[in-house]
Amino acid sequence: MLFRSGYIGSFAHTLVTHYCKPDIYFESHPEYYAYHKGERVPQQLCLTNPDVIDIVVDEVLANLERYHDPSASVQIVSLTQHDNQKYCECKNCKALDDANGSHAGTMITFVNTVAERVKAAGNYDNVVFDTFAYQYTRSAPTAVVPREDVIVRLCSIECCFGHTLDDPNCDENKDFMYDLEQWGKICNRVYIWDYVNNYRETVCIFPNFGVMQRNVQIF
């Protein structure tokens, strides 16, 4: 679905579900996908593989050719990891992650590269690129910096919602606040994906009303 000002296509978990799909490439090119625990798995991409970058750039450009609206205030392309922990551990990805102290090292480098090439291919000044700081990519990298047209969507899934995020006595939330501060130092487009209900048990009571106001004020 296309919104005039908003996301082009899906807004989450787009890598392998929308871009470089394994049902097209995995059998013939397993090297396009994550090397995890000694084998290639189709649940995530190998983000340092140059062919993967080429494919994703081409697929993004194809979507933009069809759906780009130059009159929109902003349109967002989501380049976001799938919902699992099967990140790539190949030599190149590991070296980049190690150099950045975070698996976000490969993700931000990948998104920066795709964004640069897409912008060079056409007049897409109102297009920005969105990625996650989520689970294994939640910690900010120490070397690579997101481009000005890259959004980092920081997810609070590991947080405690019985306390405010800035409660100094809550270890889970102290870790999140540290990550929020570190991302804020290197990125001017930090968005928040906050968890204001229990997605696993939607009908269960989720007593977070007392912390919601303060958490929004923090953001």
Name each region found by the language model.
Residues E59, F176-L180, N208-I218:
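Short, acidic/polar
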Residues A115:
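Active-site beta->alpha N-cap acidic-glycine motif
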Residues A140-E148, L154-N198:
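Glycoside hydrolase catalytic-domain groove-lining segments
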